[in-house]
Regions:
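Hydrophobic structural segments
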Residues: 1-141
Length: 141
């Protein structure tokens, strides 16, 4: 689901416009197991995480791309873990201070997962448009 307007507040209490989502896993799992599941699902070579491997998580918030600005929003929404990318040092500190489990899975990895779907959607809607997708990880190989 989308965040509610009551949840879309930054750490100073100001309203923000979060584009992330929040949902619930079918059953709780350990942070360590969930981290491995994210790594496999997004085909991550590596990722960074904050949290105890044996802590149970079930409510997951996510924002593809650089979503570090929404750590507090995920926390207010009741997420056990927040999946995003490009988390900066002070954002990671905030997550740790809040006790928020955090997975930084990489910018490309968190956005690339939708490319095949969007490509098909655009081809269906716009027959005269050429659509290309790239599987190359930009910048850092």
């Amino acid at each position: 689901r989308k965040y509610t307007s009551e949840e879309c507040l930054d750490e100073s209490g100001k309203s923000c416009d979060a584009i992330g989502r929040i949902g619930t896993l079918p059953s709780p799992m350990s942070m360590g197991d969930y981290t491995e599941q994210v790594k496999e699902a997004l085909n991550c070579f590596s990722l960074r995480s904050i949290g105890e491997a044996d802590e149970q998580v079930q409510t997951v918030a996510l924002c593809s791309g650089a979503g570090g600005d929404f750590i507090y929003t995920a926390y207010r929404a009741g997420a056990d873990v927040y999946v995003t990318s490009d988390v900066r040092h002070h954002e990671a500190q905030l997550a740790q201070e809040l006790g928020m489990n955090l997975i930084d899975a990489g910018h490309f990895e968190t956005e690339n997962i939708i490319c095949e779907f969007l490509s098909g959607y655009l081809l269906d809607k716009f027959e005269d448009v050429n659509v290309r997708t790239s599987a190359a990880v930009p910048y850092f190989a």
